[in-house]
From Swiss-Prot:
Residues 155-164 have a biased composition (Acidic residues). Disruption phenotype: Normal vegetative growth, pollen production and viability are severely reduced, male meiosis I is defective. Residues 1-31, 69-98, 146-168 are annotated as: Disordered. Residues 13-23 have a biased composition (Basic residues). Keywords: Cell cycle, Cell division, Cyclin, Meiosis. Transcribed preferentially in early stages of meiocyte development and during meiosis in young flowers, especially in anthers. Pfam families: Cyclin_C, Cyclin_N. It comes from Oryza sativa subsp. japonica. Residues 79-88 have a biased composition (Basic and acidic residues). The gene is SDS. It comes from the Eukaryota. This is Cyclin-SDS-like. Belongs to the cyclin family.
Length: 469
C-alpha cells in the first residue's frame, strides 16, 4: 500500500472487549463515572480529524472506559461510524499531478488536461514556423480549405469539376472577402483595438480595385481528347500528367492582363507594367540570394500575376509590396525547413523599405483575393514531363529550365496555359541543341486538344533562342 493512501477503517473491533488475550496482563481497574465524564469532555474538546488513527484511538478510549460501566451501550460503541464513499464536493482534493509524482499512474483531471494542452499549443505557436502576427476581431472562421479540397478530390469529382472551368474573362465586379474581413466592421466588442498588422490589412483591402474589363484575350479551353497525342509508357506518369493538365484549368484563366493595363487612362496602367518587370527581377535575385528552390520563384510570380488578373491596389509602393508578399507566401508553401521561416524584419526594393507587418498584411490580402487557392500549377510542374518525353540529356534540361525562367520576364506567356509554355520551352531547347526528333516527341505528347495553340506559343517565345547559345 502506498504511504500516502489512508488505511481502511475496520468494520469490527480488533479484539473482543471482554476477551482477554492469551499471555496478556490483567485488565486495568474499571474507571469511575467521574473519569468517564472527564474522558468524554476531553474528547469533545478535540478538533475533528479525518485521520483514521485518531478516531480509532478515541474509539478505544470510549470502549475501555465504558466496558465495565455501560454494558447496554456497548454494541453501539463497538460499531464504528461508516466513512462516506465519496468525498464532499467542497473538500479540497489533491491535484492529480501531485499524486502522480508520488504514486504514479494517476489519471489527471479534465481541467488539468486542458491546461496542459493549451500550454503545449502555446509553445508550438512560439516556434519559427508560426507568424507572430495574429488576426484581430475574428468573429468567425471558415473551415474551407482549397488545398485540402485539391488533395482529396477523386477522379470522378475532377471530371465533373472540369466542365465548370471558366474559359472566359475573370470579371471580379462582385469580388467579396471572407467573413474575416467582414467581422472587422460588425464586431461585438466595439472597444477592441485591432493590431497594427490587421489595420494595415483593412487599409489595403479598401484600396483594392477589382478588375472589370470585359474583353481580354484568353486561351481556349478544350477538353482533353482520350485518343489524341502520344502517351507516356509509365502509367503513373500518364495519370499524373493528365491530372496536372486538368488542374491547371480549374478556376484559373490564362490571359494577358498587361494589354488591359496598358489601355487604361492615366499613368497607373503603365506603372503596373513597369513594376511587374522590376518585381520579377527582384524575386529572381532574392531567390538566388536566399538559395530558394525554382518552384518558389515560379509560384511567387504566378501568385502576383493571378492577383493582378483579378484586380490591383493603388500606388506603386503597394505594387512592390505585392511582389514581396507573393514571394514570402510562396516561400512558406514550397520551401522546407528552415527556409520556409520568414525571419526578416524588413525588406528592401531599391530605395524603398517595407516592414514585416506590411508584408504580412499584404499576404492576407493576396489570399483573400485569390479565395485562398494558392496551390496552382506552374510552368515548372510540366518541365519534368516534357523533358522525360524528349529523352533529354543534361544540356537540354539545363537550357530548358533557363529559358523557362527567362519566359517569366515577358508578359506574353500569360495568354497561354502553363503546360503550353513548358512544352514550347522544351521544344525550343531541343531545336537549339539540334535535336529535332525530341522536339517532335514533345509536341506529340502535348497536343491532345483540337486547335491547340502550341504553334502560336512557340512564335511568341521565339526571342528566347537569342539566349540559347
Amino acid at each position: 500500500m502506498p504511504p500516502t493512501m489512508l488505511a481502511s477503517v475496520p468494520t469490527r473491533p480488533r479484539s473482543h472487549p471482554f476477551r482477554r488475550r492469551r499471555g496478556a496482563a490483567a485488565a486495568a481497574p474499571p474507571l469511575l463515572p467521574d473519569q468517564i465524564a472527564a474522558a468524554a469532555a476531553a474528547a469533545a474538546k478535540r478538533p475533528a480529524e479525518s485521520s483514521t488513527s485518531a478516531s480509532s484511538c478515541f474509539h478505544s478510549e470510549v470502549i475501555s472506559a465504558t466496558s465495565t460501566t455501560c454494558p447496554t451501550s456497548l454494541a453501539a460503541a463497538q460499531r464504528p461510524e461508516k466513512r462516506p464513499r465519496y468525498q464532499d464536493v467542497d473538500e479540497e482534493q489533491p491535484a492529480a499531478s501531485e499524486c502522480s509524482e508520488i504514486i504514479g499512474g494517476a489519471r489527471p483531471r479534465a481541467a488539468e488536461v486542458e491546461v496542459s494542452e493549451s500550454s503545449c499549443l502555446a509553445s508550438v505557436l512560439e516556434s519559427y514556423l508560426a507568424c507572430p502576427e495574429q488576426l484581430a476581431n475574428d468573429a468567425e472562421t471558415t473551415a474551407y480549405s482549397s488545398a485540402r479540397e485539391d488533395l482529396t478530390l477523386s477522379e470522378t469529382e475532377e471530371e465533373e469539376e472540369e466542365e465548370e472551368v471558366r474559359s472566359g474573362p475573370c470579371i471580379c465586379t462582385d469580388c467579396s472577402f471572407s467573413p474575416l474581413h467582414e467581422s472587422s466592421s460588425s464586431s461585438d466588442d466595439d472597444n477592441a483595438v485591432p493590431s497594427p498588422t490587421f489595420s494595415l490589412f483593412l487599409a489595403l483591402a479598401e484600396q483594392f480595385v477589382p478588375f472589370t474589363h470585359p474583353k481580354t484575350p484568353t486561351a481556349t479551353d478544350v477538353a482533353l481528347q482520350a485518343g489524341e497525342g502520344k502517351r507516356f509508357e509509365d502509367l503513373d506518369n500518364e495519370v499524373s500528367y493528365e491530372r496536372f493538365r486538368r488542374r491547371e484549368r480549374r478556376g484559373v484563366v490564362a490571359r494577358d492582363y498587361i494589354e488591359v493595363y496598358s489601355s487604361m487612362l492615366g499613368s497607373y496602367g503603365r506603372a503596373v507594367v513597369e513594376q511587374r518587370v522590376v518585381m520579377v527581377n527582384w524575386i529572381m535575385e532574392h531567390s538566388q540570394a536566399m538559395k530558394l528552390q525554382p518552384e518558389t520563384v515560379f509560384m511567387g510570380i504566378g501568385l502576383m500575376d493571378r492577383f493582378l488578373t483579378r484586380g490591383y491596389v493603388k500606388g506603386s509602393r503597394n505594387l512592390q509590396l505585392l511582389g514581396i508578399a507573393c514571394t514570402t507566401l510562396a516561400t512558406r508553401i514550397e520551401e522546407n525547413q528552415p527556409y520556409n521561416c520568414i525571419l526578416q524584419k524588413a525588406f528592401k526594393v531599391g530605395i524603398n523599405t517595407y516592414s514585416r507587418s506590411e508584408v504580412v498584411a499584404m499576404e492576407w490580402l493576396v489570399q483573400e483575393v485569390l479565395d485562398f487557392q494558392c496551390f496552382v500549377t506552374t510552368t515548372h510542374h510540366f518541365l519534368w514531363f516534357y523533358l522525360k518525353a524528349a529523352n533529354a540529356d543534361d544540356r537540354v534540361e539545363d537550357l530548358a529550365k533557363y529559358l523557362a525562367l527567362l519566359s517569366l520576364l515577358d508578359h506574353k506567356h500569360l495568354s497561354f496555359w502553363p503546360s503550353t509554355v513548358a512544352a514550347a520551352v522544351v521544344a525550343l531547347a531541343c531545336l537549339a541543341t539540334n535535336n529535332e526528333s525530341s522536339c517532335h516527341l514533345v509536341m506529340e505528347t502535348h497536343m491532345r486538344t483540337k486547335n491547340d495553340d502550341l504553334p502560336e506559343c512557340l512564335m511568341s517565345l521565339e526571342w528566347l533562342t537569342n539566349y540559347a547559345s
